[in-house]
């Protein structure tokens, strides 16, 4: 899971030389770079924050050449104070410009600069400004990801998400522009919003705050006990501030209520009678079940679900109102109940035709094929509705990898069937058969380099490597959804149930 630069270059701290000396638990401060034990090995890490919990001081460390998801709160005992610490450089004061004067409040026509005297921005400035104000199409991101194969393949050969900003890789042109856009948005938007402004700006897209600084917040929860699993969050989640002082918080795996005290949690578990998500069971096959939960009818449960998922989704922003959303939760059945594996949400009435607003597989169940089940189930529902579905854009790094794999496998399987029958096929036919939008089909074909222009005609070519890969994947046992076992009809909602509940 390490996600640093390809050459192993340092990714924490600035390139300027730093003062080095020994430190103590009392003198070390935010911004220092120290040696911290991780997985039994000493690693260079920058201390981003310090807090005091019930067990003592803890330090939030960003490890060198590791993805941001692997940042963690560590106790004092894991810091090596026998080695020198790199101290942060003092901030340089900006030199004052003696020529700078206060601009007059009212400028007369005589003092206004003429058009000739105004400096014309350079081509670089013009292009940067226009690109920053114009969002990049998803196609560029797909092609950019396809070129950066080395950045998406881990040391064990499995696909891993490594954002250049998070992991410290050298960003490409598209990545630089993406960062510039974010910085521009942060400068343009106020740091905080009032409740009224938040409501006005809140986008109905399953995504927990409109504040641009929320995404970059330091993770506030160190450890979560969820059923029989101990989870270590990846990102900040807006739980009550008092929970940040706890070494571990306890979350009921059925009702998703959260507690900071073990005694209170134990008392709750004795009284909690819920053994499955509070909704209608739509699908049951072997050990897998799917439940549909209406955000309007189960507000508390759905809000708790959003808080839980925010710890593992960087850009999830839905929290205030869950009324306009339906939540589809996948569970694994045991003798003790139905344990949540993952979920996806969708708008009751999507103006853009999205069939998924937010999707998550719980960390303890990742890399086991459950993510594919969630994606397949969302498309099966779209097929029953008679619609073409697509996830909300832009996708996260892990989401893009999962969807691209699903799209590739299904499109390839569909095309191989036509090839064996020696029949012609169109993009519209692929889209209708797989309940995918034509845009997603085209993007996938382009990413796989399967769409070519030959003799004044567009053709689809299947490379030999993809055929060989298909034969290998056939040998693997995959989890799939049986469409015949889905007991569901598209729900019909009143106008009030499709809107925000304020």
Curated annotation (Swiss-Prot):
Question: A Pfam family for this UniProt protein?
Answer: zf-MYST
Q: Which residues take part in binding acetyl-CoA?
A: 357-361, 366-372, 396
Q: Which residues carry this modification: N6-acetyllysine?
A: 316
User: What are the Tudor-knot domain coordinates in residue numbering?
Assistant: 28-80
In chain numbering, motif ESA1-RPD3 motif lies across: 299-320
Q: Location of site Important for catalytic activity?
A: 358
Q: Where is the composition biased (Polar residues)?
A: 142-151
Q: Is Acetylation included in the keywords of this UniProt record?
A: yes
Q: Where is the MYST-type HAT domain?
A: 216-490
- Answer whether the UniProt record assigns the keyword Zinc to this protein: yes
Q: What InterPro entries does this protein's entry cite?
A: Acyl_CoA_acyltransferase (IPR016181), Chromo-like_dom_sf (IPR016197), HAT_MYST-type (IPR002717), MYST_HAT (IPR050603), Tudor-knot (IPR025995), WH-like_DNA-bd_sf (IPR036388), Zf-MYST (IPR040706)
The Gene Ontology terms for molecular function here are: chromatin binding; histone acetyltransferase activity; peptide 2-hydroxyisobutyryltransferase activity; peptide crotonyltransferase activity; transcription coregulator activity; zinc ion binding
- Per the record, where are the segments of Basic residues compositional bias? 112-122
Q: Where is the composition biased (Basic and acidic residues)?
A: 88-100, 184-194
Q: Which GO terms describe its cellular component?
A: chromatin; nucleus
Q: How is it modified after translation?
A: Autoacetylation at Lys-316 is required for proper function.
**Which keywords describe this protein according to UniProt?**
Acetylation, Activator, Chromatin regulator, Chromosome, DNA damage, DNA repair, Metal-binding, Nucleus, Transcription, Transcription regulation, Transferase, Zinc, Zinc-finger
List locations, semicolon-separated: Nucleus; Chromosome
Region spans: Disordered: 1-24, 88-194
- Zinc finger extent (C2HC MYST-type): 249-274
What family is reported? Answer: Belongs to the MYST (SAS/MOZ) family.
Q: How does it assemble?
A: Component of the NuA4 histone acetyltransferase complex.
Function of the protein: Catalytic component of the NuA4 histone acetyltransferase (HAT) complex which is involved in epigenetic transcriptional activation of selected genes principally by acetylation of nucleosomal histones H4, H3, H2B, H2A and H2A variant H2A.Z. Acetylates histone H4 to form H4K5ac, H4K8ac, H4K12ac and H4K16ac, histone H3 to form H3K14ac, and histone H2A to form H2AK4ac and H2AK7ac. The NuA4 complex is involved in the DNA damage response and is required for chromosome segregation. The NuA4 complex plays a direct role in repair of DNA double-strand breaks (DSBs) through homologous recombination.
Domain comment?
The ESA1-RPD3 motif is common to ESA1 and RPD3 and is required for ESA1 histone acetyl-transferase (HAT) activity and RPD3 histone deacetylase (HDAC) activity.
Q: What is this protein called?
A: Histone acetyltransferase ESA1
This chain's source organism reads: Gibberella zeae (strain ATCC MYA-4620 / CBS 123657 / FGSC 9075 / NRRL 31084 / PH-1)
State which gene encodes it.
ESA1
């Amino acid at each position: 899971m390490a996600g640093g630069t390809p050459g192993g270059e340092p990714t924490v701290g600035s390139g300027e030389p730093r003062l080095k000396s020994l430190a103590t638990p009392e003198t070390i401060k935010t911004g220092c770079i120290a040696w911290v034990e991780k997985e039994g090995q000493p690693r260079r890490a920058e201390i981003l924050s310090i807090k005091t919990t019930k067990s003592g001081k803890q330090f939030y460390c960003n490890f060198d050449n590791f993805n941001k998801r692997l940042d963690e709160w560590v106790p004092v005992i894991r810091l090596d104070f026998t080695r020198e610490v790199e101290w942060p450089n003092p901030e340089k004061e900006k030199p004052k410009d003696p020529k700078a004067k206060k601009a007059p409040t009212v400028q007369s026509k005589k003092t206004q600069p003429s058009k000739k005297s105004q400096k014309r921005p350079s081509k670089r400035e013009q292009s940067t400004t226009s690109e920053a104000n114009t969002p990049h199409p998803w196609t560029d991101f797909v092609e950019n990801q396809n070129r950066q194969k080395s950045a998406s393949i881990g040391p064990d050969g499995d696909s891993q998400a490594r954002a250049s900003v998070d992991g410290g890789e050298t960003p490409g042109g598209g990545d630089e522009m993406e960062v510039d856009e974010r910085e521009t948005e942060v400068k343009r938007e106020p740091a905080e919003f009032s409740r009224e402004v938040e409501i006005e700006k809140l986008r109905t897209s399953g995504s927990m705050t409109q504040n641009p600084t929320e995404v970059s917040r330091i993770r506030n929860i160190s450890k979560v006990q969820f059923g029989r699993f101990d989870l270590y969050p990846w990102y900040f989640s807006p739980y009550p501030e008092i929970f940040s002082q706890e070494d571990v918080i306890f979350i009921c795996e059925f009702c998703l209520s959260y507690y900071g005290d073990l005694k209170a949690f134990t008392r709750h578990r004795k009284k909690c009678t819920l053994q499955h998500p509070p909704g209608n069971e739509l699908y049951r096959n072997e050990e897998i079940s799917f439940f549909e939960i209406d955000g309007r009818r189960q507000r508390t449960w759905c809000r708790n679900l959003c808080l839980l998922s925010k710890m593992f989704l960087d850009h999830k922003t839905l929290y205030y109102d869950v009324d306009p959303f339906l939540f589809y939760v996948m569970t694994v059945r045991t003798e003790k109940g139905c344990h949540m594996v993952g979920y996806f949400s969708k708008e009751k009435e999507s103006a853009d035709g999205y069939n998924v607003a937010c999707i998550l597989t719980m960390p303890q169940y990742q890399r086991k094929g459950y993510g594919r089940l969630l994606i397949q189930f969302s498309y099966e529902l779209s097929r029953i509705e008679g619609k073409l579905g697509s996830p909300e854009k832009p996708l996260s790094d892990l989401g893009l990898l999962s969807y691209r794999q699903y799209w590739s496998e299904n499109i390839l399987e569909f095309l191989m069937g036509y090839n064996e029958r020696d029949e012609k096929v169109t993009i519209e036919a692929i889209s209708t058969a797989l309940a995918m939008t034509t845009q997603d089909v085209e993007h996938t074909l382009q990413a796989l380099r399967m769409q070519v222009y030959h003799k004044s005609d567009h053709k689809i070519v299947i490379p030999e490597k993809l055929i060989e890969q298909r034969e290998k994947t056939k040998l693997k046992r995959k989890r799939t959804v049986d469409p015949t076992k889905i007991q569901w009809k598209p729900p019909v909602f009143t106008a009030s149930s499709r809107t925000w509940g304020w």
